[in-house]
């Protein structure tokens, strides 16, 4: 005891405070870095690409999802240090699957020509392609397209930098309750299992679009609004030793369980879309959207009962997009087209601010 008291000097107190600040800073930065925002462009009144990227930077949004390799956006991203999930659109999947020469051309034109000035982290080959939706005509081409892009990325010398995956939705899940019993639909296993095997072998995550809003609005009699908005005061689902207070976690963990049942226990998940509309349909209100988004950003730092670690999550979307249909789809934006924020959201303080703060403390020690 006396030894400890002997070293309890103002200098040691300052060092201790510095350590606590650094820990707090690392937690805040980790939480902020867990969140990205999807940059959709289906509007006729949106800011230009340079303005958009400056808005990302000014709001400390460190990750961005592009749905296609728009060269104007990629040019604006140069030197921004923003990590990018780059989409290969559904319209290109069949072409890319047909031959390596097409994959090499796509990677050269849309990836290598911008690397390393643009920090491309993932290639999302296709979005929500599924044998049980209107995209079923593309299902046989998806895994071959992913393989070809993966090979082309490797040939370009970027295999250690960029992961190749695809973005799926919850229609592929056959059972999601309780979360530990999650499994893919039996009639989709022929499609899903090769994707899971590819991701396992290449150590890439599955990209999953998770929307508690659609589950709630489609079944409000059985799914409560607080459970959907992260505001339930008590445990809603007890699944063995795991307790679920929000639908987002339950949906996410059901996909983890489904991956495990398909041989993908080692495959991670990135939430490639999640959001809540502010108008346009049942349950789509400003207050609900504000509550969901604020709580999602906070919750992404914490993880789910099955995987209690930060969840890399991309919010849909940056702007309200007036060319989208149906009406509901026009109201998912975090910002209005005039760049004014719709909600008071905190994406975390920038590392430079925290570095300056800790630097001044160090100078006083």
From Swiss-Prot:
Keywords: Glycoprotein, Glycosidase, Hydrolase, Plant defense, Signal, Vacuole. This is Glucan endo-1,3-beta-glucosidase, basic vacuolar isoform. PROSITE patterns: GLYCOSYL_HYDROL_F17. It comes from Nicotiana plumbaginifolia (Leadwort-leaved tobacco). One of its GO terms (molecular function) is glucan endo-1,3-beta-D-glucosidase activity. Residues 1-32 form the signal peptide. Glycans are attached at residue 356. InterPro entries: Glyco_hydro_17, Glyco_hydro_17_plant, Glycoside_hydrolase_SF. Pfam families: Glyco_hydro_17 (PF00332). Its EC number is 3.2.1.39. Belongs to the glycosyl hydrolase 17 family. Implicated in the defense of plants against pathogens. The active site is at 128 (proton donor), 273 (nucleophile).
């Amino acid at each position: 005891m006396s030894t400890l008291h002997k070293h309890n000097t103002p200098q040691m107190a300052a060092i201790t405070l510095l350590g606590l600040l650094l820990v707090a800073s690392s937690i805040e930065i980790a939480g902020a870095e867990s969140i990205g925002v999807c940059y959709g462009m289906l509007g006729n009144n949106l800011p230009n690409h340079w303005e958009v990227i400056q808005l990302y930077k000014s709001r400390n949004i460190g990750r961005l999802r592009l749905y296609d390799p728009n060269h104007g956006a990629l040019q604006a991203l140069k030197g921004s240090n923003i990590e990018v999930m780059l989409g290969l659109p559904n319209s290109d999947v069949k072409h890319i699957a047909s031959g390596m020469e097409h994959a090499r051309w796509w990677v050269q034109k849309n990836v290598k020509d911008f690397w390393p000035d643009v920090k491309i982290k993932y290639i999302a080959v296709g979005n929500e392609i599924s044998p049980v939706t209107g995209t079923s005509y593309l299902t046989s081409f998806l895994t071959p397209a992913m393989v070809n892009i993966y090979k082309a990325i490797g040939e370009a010398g970027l295999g250690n930098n960029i992961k190749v995956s695809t973005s799926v939705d919850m229609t592929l899940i056959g059972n999601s309750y309780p979360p530990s019993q999650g499994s893919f639909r039996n009639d989709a296993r022929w499609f899903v299992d090769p994707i899971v095997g590819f991701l396992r072998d290449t150590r890439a995550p599955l990209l999953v679009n998770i929307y508690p809003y659609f589950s709630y609005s489609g079944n409000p009699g059985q799914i409560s609004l607080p459970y959907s908005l992260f505001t339930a005061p008590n445990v809603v689902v007890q699944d063995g030793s795991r307790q679920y207070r929000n639908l987002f976690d339950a949906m996410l963990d059901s996909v983890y369980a489904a991956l495990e049942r398909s041989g993908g226990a080692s495959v991670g998940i990135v939430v490639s879309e999640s959001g809540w509309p502010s108008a346009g349909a049942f349950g789509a209100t400003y207050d609900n959207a504000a509550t969901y988004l604020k709580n999602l950003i906070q919750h992404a730092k914490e993880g789910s009962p099955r995987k209690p670690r930060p969840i890399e999550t991309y919010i849909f979307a940056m702007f309200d997009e007036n060319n989208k249909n149906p009406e509901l789809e026009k109201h998912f934006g975090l910002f209005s087209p005039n760049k004014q924020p719709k909600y008071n959201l905190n994406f975390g303080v920038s590392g430079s601010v925290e570095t300056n703060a800790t630097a001044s403390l160090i100078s006083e020690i």
